[in-house]
Amino acid sequence: MKKFSKTLRDNWIFLLMVLPGALWLILFFYIPVFGNVVAFKDYHMTSNGFIDSIVNSKWVGLDNFRFLFSSKDAFIITRNTVLYNLGFIFIGLIVSVGIAIILSELRSKRMVKIFQTSMLFPYFLSWVIISFFTDAFLNIDKGVFNHFLTSIGMKEVNFYADLGIWPYLLLFLGIWKGFGYSSVMYYATIMGIDPTYYEAATVDGASKWQRIRNVTIPQLTSLVTVLTILAVGNIFRADFGLFYQIPHNAGQLYNVTNVLDVYVFNGLTQTADIGMASAAGLYQSVVGLILVILSNLLARRVDPNSALF
């Protein structure tokens, strides 16, 4: 007990710094965990509040999960959610690392700051705002693309009914919005690499590409592994704004835009089935946890120093 008290006294300033984040986690992550019981109930809101509604709602076991995955759209939403996220993870990784390496090779610090700012800007834009820009290009009546097509004598294209372009467009927009944030982290790591490694490689006659391949990329391995493990944990979670706002929830596009989060939202707004929505959220969390553990075990087998825990 004395040792614990001494530790508190010696580190009180650090504990104080952690306190806001810890309170945020407790209030918005740990306390709401108890609400997962709704996933196993036929939840109906009563006038006596949330707790009373949970207590008095009937237990239905796994019925909410059965309803979620017995629908005809279960395969489509699972396929879309997983495949899009795999694209975001691996293509986004290549783009982010590539941009970070290019930035590290620039000698003008002013240019680096300009590029960093321009790349980070999309990260802070709302999907609602981005959807207006995409609509300005794709709209069948006043869109820039259709205006160009008609000006050269071609027929208008209804992009909001054309399934072919949307997987590529959504992948592009998702990576475009997020790669700036990731590339800044990789760039910061590259800037922290000991310059003597590069000097030794140069003395040995290594070309620029060989220095990147044998010095830069190995030094990024740990960060790449950690970020990939965390991303894999969210592979069953889709960016709701991207898949709902950009295609305007168009029914003709459901085969390529319908993901788990959009499906749950549409089901919730149409049927007000809170139990099913909770079941979907719990399913995403449990699968995400399992994937993080498995990914970490795999990373530990390959390189113990790169494992998350």
Where are these regions (language model features)?
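A structural signal for multi-pass alpha-helical bundles of membrane permease subunits
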Residues: 2-309
